[in-house]
């Protein structure tokens, strides 16, 4: 049986939260339904808005100059927010998006962006798509390999393996990341139970993946740790909401920030959700 861990509540009263990023001692998050990016003080949960994104923000990441990249979901844009708050279009993702643009990870200036692949809220038929690669100068391409709802992205501690949540594929996939940022050798890293829909994820220093189990409430809702090959070792059950995203942070990089949203697919389609930030200590440190 997996080891169970408890959680504490840090903040509530949000819409649909996504893409937590711990950066410079603060927690940055997207709020889909309130169309804003916020920054939170992880000590007490207080927060403020730092950007309006009318077409709904999703994935977040940072460049070496301190500017922030923001995925704008509905119009398939990758935005760049400078330190002074000025926002410009970094890349147009539209030619490569099926459905909304989604979560993202930035590694050495390269952005890897997921997309739904189809109109989820509209009830369209499920379709495969491709992970999107955006170079530091804004060039966009589709990564080889058909994937099913590419979502959370993370770099393995080995520095050369990029991991991907395939939400409706019920698995964690992997690519080899080349020195120029391109991805090759798409493969399955861990098969998950059919009731697990991995969303946002993070990696600990031992190489285990912590992922959120989305689109489900009840006994299996929450967060899980899986090792390469599919062995689940730990879990944090959150039966009152979807598990959506997770990241390590804190002064010692040993606090898990858990993003949960109380909603259902019909409510999600109508823009209704109650978002929470929760925390857990699991005896491990983040890799990144």
What is each residue range found by the language model?
Residues 1-15, 45, 186-187, 280-283:
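A short helix->beta-strand "capping" segment at the edge of beta-propeller domains
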Residues 1-5, 25, 34, 40, ...:
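Blade/loop signatures of beta-propeller domains
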Residues 11-25, 53-72, 94-113, 118, ...:
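Beta-rich, blade/repeat-based domains predominating
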Residues 32-33, 73-74, 118-129, 167-170, ...:
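Short, solvent-exposed loop/turn segments at conserved positions within beta-propeller repeat blades
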Residues 36-38, 77-79, 129-132, 171-173, ...:
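A short loop-to-beta-strand structural motif that recurs across blades of beta-propeller domains
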Residues 41-45, 81-86, 134-138, 176-181, ...:
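Short loop/turn segments that connect beta-strands within beta-propeller blades
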Residues 48-52, 88-92, 141-145, 183-191, ...:
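Beta-propeller fold detector
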Residues 247-288:
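Blade-level signature of beta-propeller repeat domains, shared across WD40, Kelch, NHL, RCC1
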């Amino acid at each position: 049986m997996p080891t169970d861990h408890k959680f504490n509540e840090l903040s509530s009263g949000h819409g649909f939260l996504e893409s937590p990023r711990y950066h410079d001692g603060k927690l940055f998050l997207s709020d889909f339904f309130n169309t804003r990016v916020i920054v939170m003080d992880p000590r007490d949960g207080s927060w403020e808005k730092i950007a309006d994104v009318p077409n709904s923000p999703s994935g977040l990441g940072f460049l070496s100059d301190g500017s922030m990249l923001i995925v704008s979901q509905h119009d398939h844009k990758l935005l760049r927010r400078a330190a002074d708050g000025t926002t410009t279009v970094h890349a147009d993702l539209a030619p490569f998006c099926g459905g909304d643009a989604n979560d993202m990870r930035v590694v050495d200036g390269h952005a890897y962006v997921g997309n739904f692949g189809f109109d989820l809220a509209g009830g369209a038929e499920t379709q495969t798509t491709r992970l999107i690669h955006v170079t530091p100068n804004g060039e966009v391409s589709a990564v080889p390999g058909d994937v099913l709802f590419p979502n959370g992205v993370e770099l393995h501690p080995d520095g050369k393996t990029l991991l991907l949540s395939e939400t409706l594929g019920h698995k964690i996939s992997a690519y080899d990341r080349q020195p120029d940022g391109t991805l090759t050798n798409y493969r399955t890293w861990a098969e998950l139970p059919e009731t697990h829909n991995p969303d946002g994820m993070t990696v600990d220093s031992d190489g285990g993946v912590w992922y959120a189990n989305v689109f489900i409430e009840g006994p299996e809702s929450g967060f899980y740790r899986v090792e390469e090959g599919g062995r689940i070792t730990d879990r944090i059950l959150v039966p009152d909401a979807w598990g959506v995203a997770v990241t390590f942070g804190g002064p010692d990089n040993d606090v898990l920030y858990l993003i949960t949203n109380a909603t259902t697919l019909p409510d999600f389609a109508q823009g209704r959700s109650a978002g929470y930030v929760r925390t857990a200590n699991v005896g491990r440190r983040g890799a990144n």
